[in-house]
């Protein structure tokens, strides 16, 4: 008697089923984004704390913008990337009036998943770093899935 054990296969979401050519995306591609920190970007205004310095969610938003700048313009028509994972540390405060600069470098391609190494700096020092993952989706298929979720 022979037994064969197989792990259950993860079901691929429908918006990821079609194969697309991402060969024009290359490891090492970089994007960046900048922001002048204003009162509207502080933790009290965002709702993430009480100290009037750059809010972590704003830094993360800038990191995602840097990742978009690296690759979004190279994606095939009808496709875009969506953020699916962040592992970021925010380790230095930035006051209102100071400029911040975020960078994202594409370090790995795994099918439709794009993995970035990310960093953020203010005018004086590094303020955050980590990794960020995005997945490339067919926008029409993704929108259909969202409409089904809404019951439309």
Where are these regions (language model features)?
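Catalytic strand-loop segment that frames the active site of acyl-thioester-processing enzymes
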Residues: 20-54
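Intrinsic-disorder/low-complexity, polar/charged segments enriched in Ser/Thr/Lys/Arg/Asp/Glu/Gln
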Residues: 26-32, 85, 99-101, 113-115, ...
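Short, residue-level hotspots on alpha-helical faces of the histone-fold
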Residues: 61-65, 69
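Hydrophobic beta-strand-centered segment that forms part of the acyl-chain substrate-binding groove
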Residues: 68-101
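Hydrophobic beta-sheet segments that form the core/acyl-binding groove
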Residues: 88-123
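C-terminal output/interaction extensions
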Residues: 128, 133-152
């Amino acid at each position: 008697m022979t037994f064969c054990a197989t792990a259950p296969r993860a079901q691929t979401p429908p918006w990821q089923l079609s194969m697309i050519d991402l060969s024009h995306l290359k490891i090492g591609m970089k994007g960046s984004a900048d922001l002048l920190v204003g009162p509207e970007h502080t933790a009290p205004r965002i709702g993430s704390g009480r100290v009037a310095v750059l809010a972590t969610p704003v830094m993360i938003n800038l990191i995602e913008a840097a990742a978009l700048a690296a690759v979004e313009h190279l994606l095939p028509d009808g496709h875009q990337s969506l953020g699916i994972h962040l592992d970021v540390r925010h380790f230095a405060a930035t006051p209102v009036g100071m400029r911040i600069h975020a960078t994202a470098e594409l370090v790995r391609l795994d099918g439709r998943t794009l993995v970035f190494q990310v960093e953020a700096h203010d005018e004086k020092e590094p303020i955050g770093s980590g990794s960020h993952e995005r997945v490339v989706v067919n926008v029409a298929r993704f929108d259909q899935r969202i409409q089904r979720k809404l019951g439309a």
